Curated annotation (Swiss-Prot):
<dbReference type="GO" id="GO:0000287">
    <property type="term" value="F:magnesium ion binding"/>
</dbReference>
<keyword id="KW-0812">Transmembrane</keyword>
<comment type="function">
    <text>Prenyltransferase that catalyzes the transfer of the geranylgeranyl moiety of geranylgeranyl diphosphate (GGPP) to the C2 hydroxyl of (S)-3-O-geranylgeranylglyceryl phosphate (GGGP). This reaction is the second ether-bond-formation step in the biosynthesis of archaeal membrane lipids.</text>
</comment>
<dbReference type="InterPro" id="IPR044878">
    <property type="entry name" value="UbiA_sf"/>
</dbReference>
<keyword id="KW-1208">Phospholipid metabolism</keyword>
<keyword id="KW-0444">Lipid biosynthesis</keyword>
<keyword id="KW-0460">Magnesium</keyword>
<feature type="transmembrane region" description="Helical">
    <location>
        <begin position="16"/>
        <end position="36"/>
    </location>
</feature>
<keyword id="KW-0472">Membrane</keyword>
<dbReference type="InterPro" id="IPR000537">
    <property type="entry name" value="UbiA_prenyltransferase"/>
</dbReference>
<keyword id="KW-0808">Transferase</keyword>
<feature type="transmembrane region" description="Helical">
    <location>
        <begin position="79"/>
        <end position="99"/>
    </location>
</feature>
<dbReference type="GO" id="GO:0005886">
    <property type="term" value="C:plasma membrane"/>
</dbReference>
<comment type="similarity">
    <text>Belongs to the UbiA prenyltransferase family. DGGGP synthase subfamily.</text>
</comment>
<dbReference type="GO" id="GO:0046474">
    <property type="term" value="P:glycerophospholipid biosynthetic process"/>
</dbReference>
<feature type="transmembrane region" description="Helical">
    <location>
        <begin position="252"/>
        <end position="272"/>
    </location>
</feature>
<feature type="transmembrane region" description="Helical">
    <location>
        <begin position="124"/>
        <end position="144"/>
    </location>
</feature>
Length: 272
């Protein structure tokens, strides 16, 4: 894969892209603003991932030496310039859609830069930032489809799922984070307590998920599909309690990403 594509972490950026498309499907809104919005959040997420890799250069030499910057595929300064250009493009796209969307993109851009520079290494605050940014993609889509309330509801579920997964990723990266004197949740409070918080968040998500059917937001199709996602989240929680090794956390993180994608599919199918 081209390193300039790889550094965007296209899989993660694609999830943001899908979030906006989901709001279009749910709201039965199909116009050029949706296309621009999906592209906007993809680029914004990719630029956030790039600036994050720029500031994480030293940590990634330990945790992820094959990433574009530590592997030497992209020079450090070029990564910075690349991210700033992408940020600018995403902001322009946001304002083309609407003033409100443009403001959201600017706020998210500021948050992503502050997160990468400082907040990521602060206990739990960094996790909250990533989860908030993920949730805001649905709000962003809701602004386009004129259904902000639903955007906030789905954004809340995305927030819970992302927050749990971010804690798992911190446990996976604990070795490199310790060497860089980061103050992540598992470093400050221990791996077991961090796992328990991730598990609790997973359980809360599973318990609340049927409410979207109960309150007639989505159809029975949603309930059938979300059960699959819930099973994956429960299984991930079980694995996390059993084994906190780097390899296990990496596997659990992947399982949870699959669970999130299935949950997103349930949103779309439940609205048809």
């Amino acid at each position: 894969m081209n390193p300039y594509i790889e550094i965007l972490r296209p899989t993660n950026a694609l999830m943001a892209f899908i979030a906006v498309l989901l709001m279009a499907i749910i709201g039965h809104t199909y116009n050029y603003e949706i296309i621009l919005g999906s592209l906007c959040v993809f680029i914004a997420t990719g630029s956030g991932n790039t600036i994050n890799d720029y500031y994480d250069y030293e940590i990634d030499r330990i945790n992820a030496p094959n990433r574009p910057i530590p592997s030497g595929k992209i020079e450090l300064k070029r990564a910075l310039y690349y991210s700033l250009i992408l940020f600018l493009v995403s902001i322009i796209l946001g304002f083309i859609i609407s003033l409100e969307n443009g403001i959201v993109v600017i706020l998210c851009t500021i948050l992503m830069i502050i997160y990468a520079y400082d907040l990521k290494q602060r206990c739990f605050i960094g996790n909250l930032c990533v989860a908030i940014l993920t949730g805001l993609t649905f709000v962003f889509g809701g602004l386009i489809t004129k259904d902000v309330n639903l955007g906030f509801i789905l954004g809340f579920f995305a927030f819970l799922m992302t927050l749990s997964r971010e804690i798992i990723k911190d446990i996976e990266d604990i070795e490199g984070d310790k060497k860089e004197d980061a103050h992540t949740l598992p470093i400050i409070y221990g791996t077991k307590k961090a796992v328990m918080l991730a598990v609790i968040l997973n359980i809360i998500t599973c318990i609340l998920s049927p409410l979207l059917y109960y309150y007639n937001i989505f159809s029975i199709v949603y309930l059938i599909i979300i059960i699959i996602a819930d099973i994956i989240f429960v299984y991930s929680a079980y694995l996390a309690v059993q084994n906190q090794s780097k390899e296990s956390m990496h596997k659990i993180s992947k399982y949870m990403k699959i669970g999130m994608l299935i949950a997103f599919v349930s949103f779309a199918m439940g609205a048809l």
